[in-house]
Curated annotation (Swiss-Prot):
GO cellular component, one term: cytosol
Cytoplasm is among the record's keywords: yes
EC annotation from Swiss-Prot or TrEMBL: 4.1.1.37
Name of protein: Uroporphyrinogen decarboxylase
Purpose: Catalyzes the decarboxylation of four acetate groups of uroporphyrinogen-III to yield coproporphyrinogen-III.
Amino acid sequence: MKEESELARIKSSKAVVSKTIKEGKQGRKIPIWLMRQAGRSLPEYRRAVKDTSSFMEICYNTDLVVELTLQPVARFSMDAAIIFSDILIVADVLGCDVDFIRGVGPTIKPVKNFKELRNPQKIETKTLPILNAIRKVRDKLPEEKSLIGFAGGPWTVASYIIEGRSSKTFSKVLNLHPSSLEQIIEQITEVTISYLVKQIEFGADVIQLFDSNAGVLSGELFEECVIKPTKKIVSAIKGKFPDFPIIGFPKSAGSLYKDYCEKTGVSAVSIDYNVPIEWAKENLKIPLQGNLNPSLLAYNKMEAIKETKRIIDCFRDLPFIFNLGHGVLPNTPIENIAALVDLVKSQ
């Protein structure tokens, strides 16, 4: 009965982002939300987190997550809220000691094989504060606003787990024995499926998979480490929730975006700012999201407005969601974000 009620909720959703993806056509208006729309660019965010001791503490504080998630929707009238969290929650569930160091970013005690990872018996127990936040946000959001849940792509999470932090060379993970890498990715994939299913059950009406490190791979490695696990996640979710909108984001995948769209089964794809929009329009035959350069938005308002108009003109007749090609930079002036949202909503 629970699954039937979830299916009914998803099917009847009036949220504009999920509707654009599911119907595969552009509505009356182009929807807009921004990756990292909740965060350090907002003064209300900085006030809300000033007394917290760590980023992970924020991620597991239900009421704070609700507040932070809703802030950009309230300020800018975004068409979607994305739950305030992090792609490394799955790594934390697997027993890795995830921490965030100012000026360095995420750090993790690195592992070399899947046996070092904890076997999570009940992912819901560890992530319940986040899941409860999803439920509370959904209750507070107007029905026309989407609530986006998310997770990191298994390859990206694996690269952090093995490297221990962000890397420019990815030497540890690329030199790991293929069978060990495969086992780690498989374990991450299974946990990711469980986590995303729970997010949907608690109220998310769209899911995004952030494969932020996809661009380091090519050929067979891209197929095995990005496409294969993504396809497994998509198949598992759509097996339980048919036609559920899933956005993939294989950042910096270049021409491999085409293979990703054709082989994974994702419902829509978010393109990074290096993807030529004319190429995307010609080659990617599913709903598109993107792809303004966040640096333009942060440092050159007039050029950002000009580029936004060009993107809209290119994708106007397609099922399209306006977004950035990566996350909002912390020093982005809020007046620039407001001008961007106003422009998109006026089209």
